[in-house]
């Protein structure tokens, strides 16, 4: 696998935390990683993506005084136990970090190598912050395809979370820049997403799966959930397996 990096300084920075198997090709292009003030960023189609778990939005989500967000309600249900959760689609890592802040242990998968490196860098920075270190340490991040992982692992989990990263709404101007890039870079096709739910059920990797969907979307893989948690623009389909 090759990842194009814009300069040697970035390569030296990445070498601290990525596997030796990755090779780099240095060239100018529309999609590349670069280092700015010791922060790893992605340049893509004249847009910029930077992941920071110490920003105000994340800090508000994980504040104990803040009402539990929908993904937490859907995954925890009425349980007060600390869960082991497989997050099959890391994306920007916000849901993963929010769940880890609740005391849960996360194994988080991201198949896109660019997003993986951004997340890895963000987690390492969070590990250097006293009030975020414990949260970040509950997250294990792996650069792999979710379907492949589920079909080959011998691990089991209390819950599997699937966020297919559906395309942005028609009013794309209202979608934040980071989400615009995420939809373009990390979007999975519907067949892959349907296979993911099928594989979760087939392998019996967990007794519960939670799938995030647009509010009016069809059920993933045409499988009716056991229950649902609905919001204004999206919903969480909950499967008891």
Curated annotation (Swiss-Prot):
It catalyses: guanosine(1516) in 16S rRNA + S-adenosyl-L-methionine = N(2)-methylguanosine(1516) in 16S rRNA + S-adenosyl-L-homocysteine + H(+). Transmembrane segments: none annotated. GO terms for molecular function: rRNA (guanine-N2-)-methyltransferase activity. The keyword S-adenosyl-L-methionine applies. It is found in: Cytoplasm. S-adenosyl-L-methionine binds at residues 94-95, 163. Keywords: Cytoplasm, Methyltransferase, rRNA processing, S-adenosyl-L-methionine, Transferase. Belongs to the methyltransferase superfamily. RsmJ family. Specifically methylates the guanosine in position 1516 of 16S rRNA. This is Ribosomal RNA small subunit methyltransferase J. It comes from Francisella tularensis subsp. novicida (strain U112). The lineage of its organism: Bacteria, Pseudomonadati, Pseudomonadota, Gammaproteobacteria, Thiotrichales. The gene is rsmJ.
């Amino acid at each position: 696998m090759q990842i194009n990096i814009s300069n040697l300084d970035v390569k030296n920075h990445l070498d601290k935390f990525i596997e030796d198997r990755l090779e780099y090709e240095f060239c100018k292009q529309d999609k590349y990683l670069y280092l700015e003030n010791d922060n790893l960023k992605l340049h893509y189609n004249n847009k910029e993506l930077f992941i920071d778990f110490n920003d105000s939005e994340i800090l508000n989500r994980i504040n104990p005084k803040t009402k539990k967000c929908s993904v937490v309600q859907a995954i925890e249900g009425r349980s007060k136990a600390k869960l082991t959760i497989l997050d099959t689609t890391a994306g920007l890592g916000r849901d993963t970090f929010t769940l880890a802040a609740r005391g849960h242990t996360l194994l988080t998968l991201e198949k896109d190598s660019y997003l993986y490196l951004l997340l890895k860098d963000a987690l390492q920075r969070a590990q250097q912050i006293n009030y975020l270190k414990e949260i970040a340490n509950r997250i294990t991040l792996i650069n792999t395809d979710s379907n492949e992982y589920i079909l080959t692992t011998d691990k089991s989990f209390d819950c599997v979370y699937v966020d297919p990263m559906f395309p942005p709404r028609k009013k794309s101007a209202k979608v934040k820049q980071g989400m615009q890039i995420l939809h373009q870079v990390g979007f999975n096709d519907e067949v892959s997403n349907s296979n993911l739910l099928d594989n979760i059920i087939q392998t019996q990797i967990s007794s519960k799966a939670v799938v995030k969907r647009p509010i009016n979307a069809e059920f993933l893989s045409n499988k009716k959930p056991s229950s649902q948690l609905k919001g204004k623009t999206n919903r969480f389909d909950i499967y008891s397996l």
